[in-house]
Amino acid sequence: IFADTGWEPKFVYEHVEYLKKAITICPLITVERSNIREDLIRAANPIKGSNEEHKSFAGRVPNPPLFAAQPGGRVGMLYRQCTHDYKVIPIQKKMRELLGVKPRHRVKKGTVVEQWIGISTDEAMRMKNARLPWLTSRWPLIEMKMSRMDCLQWYRDIKKHPMPGKSSCIGCPYHHNDQWKNMQKN
């Protein structure tokens, strides 16, 4: 299941389209909450007189890890909530739908879904167990002790699939300098 934030680089959407054709053992399903970029713009520019105008920024849109200045001038990074709200929740919602569970109903006791998450060894700090009793997580790349470079080398060795780029929202401040340069150029 691919969770689309609505603000991914073009190459991510191209690779998803490739995978939809290349994967034959199961469908590649796309889910989305909404467009994170549009949500950020709307939150920063509420319509005068609307209910949105009186809500806190955090109450209207999940916080991406952006830098912000406090009234006193001190600068800090906002708490990161965007991955959970724009990826984890929509994926879990789709899993419940695929299980036939209606909103606000419990997943049947004894049901177990195993999700595989593509986190490499250089991102091991991002591993988090699912907080739902019916959902277990596996990290195959971690189990195979594969770093991002190992994954790229595997792609080079098999010469079967196009090389995927690093997936992350365009506006995410966690990009490496080469990613920023590539986005600026392309």
Report the location of each language-model feature.
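Nucleotide-activated chemistry modules centered on ATP-dependent adenylation/adenylyltransferase
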Residues: 1-186
